[in-house]
Amino acid sequence: MNKVVLLCRPGFEKECAAEITDKAGKRELFGFARVKENTGYVIYECYQPEDGEKLISELPFSSLIFARQWFVVGELLQHLPPEDRITPIVGMLQGVVEKGGELRVEVADTNESKELMKFCRKFTVPLRAALRDAGVLTHYETPKRPVVHVFFIAPGCCYTGYSLAHNHSPFYMGIPRLKFPSDAPSRSTLKLEEALHVFIPEDEWDERLANGMYAVDLGACPGGWTYQLVKRNMWVYSVDNGPMAQSLMDTGQVTWLREDGFRYRPNRNNISWMVCDMVEKPAKVTALMAQWLVNGWCRETIFNLKLPMKKRYEEVSHNLAYLQAQLDEHGVNAQIQARQLYHDREEVTVHVRRLWAAVGGRRDER
């Protein structure tokens, strides 16, 4: 199998294509990207027959910024007969996947696909039963086996394939299903909540998002991101000249500092988290984040980079490379991840975790 489907935000197909072409090429898995604007997906076609499977195995999915999900597929199945769509799909998957742990019948995240989504939901149950009978799926769901994907691009027209359990998005269509909390001050709260789900393994939440931690929110007004930290029982310094929501102030967990986020310097050395969603040029935000990390002012950070209208992949890559260079220069070992989240628009969200550093007073780094 030589094709990989990558799901992305509609309107960002070119960025997704540029990224996969660049990163696959660096691993000598050469190919070309098929792109149609505003379709919400890209197909990367490798020149060598088995390179699609190699790509989803060797390139860490966590290293991709613009892809929400990916899976390797065979040829496009077209003109599926309405009276029996199941038989051709089962035939395509037999011999390709054995004992898959889960079935996902998906579409791209576009308005045009909403009707198709209703069909996918109904179609999943009989298709799952047929795939189990054929040995393509196990008789019970298991997260340790490959996930079988059936991706409809139009009625009667789909790609079939699989993703690897250890190297994909665990979410259907790559989108965590989150509900907006009615007491949150703004919808931006969902960005940070999604980032926590995407970047931090659930079994590490109790340790890395623990009660009683200290956190800083730069550019906090009115408090959408502060809300997520307060909800996890942290003590939060919310830095912004604009006012914070009274509901957050009433918790007693928030200290509002009327300062410019770019000028603020913390006065304590046990800050676990710094978050930042300021509308500013990406280079300026990246430089500020580098300063916080190099000086050991926080252990982990999540921040947003607003994207320009053109060369968006290049802009993000340039800023992440600058951040990595600053950390390397100052002997800071850190893990950097970036993703355009479902709740992001013209922006990407970056997570950095300091693992250890040669900064005095921070011997607790691990």
From Swiss-Prot:
Cite a single GO BP annotation. rRNA processing
Q: Which reaction does it catalyse?
A: cytidine(2498) in 23S rRNA + S-adenosyl-L-methionine = 2'-O-methylcytidine(2498) in 23S rRNA + S-adenosyl-L-homocysteine + H(+)
Residues engaged in binding S-adenosyl-L-methionine: 188, 221-224, 240, 260, 277
Report the EC number(s), separated by commas if there are several: 2.1.1.186
Q: Which residues form the active site?
A: 306
Q: State a GO cellular component annotated for this protein.
A: cytoplasm
Cellular localization per UniProt: Cytoplasm
Matching entries from InterPro entries are given as:
RlmM_FDX, RlmM_THUMP-like, RNA_MeTrfase_FtsJ_dom, rRNA_MeTrfase_M, SAM-dependent_MTases_sf
Question: Does Ribonucleoprotein appear among the keywords?
Answer: no
Taxonomic superkingdom: Bacteria
Keyword field? Cytoplasm, Methyltransferase, rRNA processing, S-adenosyl-L-methionine, Transferase
User: One MF term in GO for this entry?
Assistant: S-adenosylmethionine-dependent methyltransferase activity
In the record, the note on similarity to other proteins reads: Belongs to the class I-like SAM-binding methyltransferase superfamily. RNA methyltransferase RlmE family. RlmM subfamily.
Oligomer status and interactors: Monomer.
Function according to Swiss-Prot or TrEMBL: Catalyzes the 2'-O-methylation at nucleotide C2498 in 23S rRNA.
Q: What is this protein called?
A: Ribosomal RNA large subunit methyltransferase M
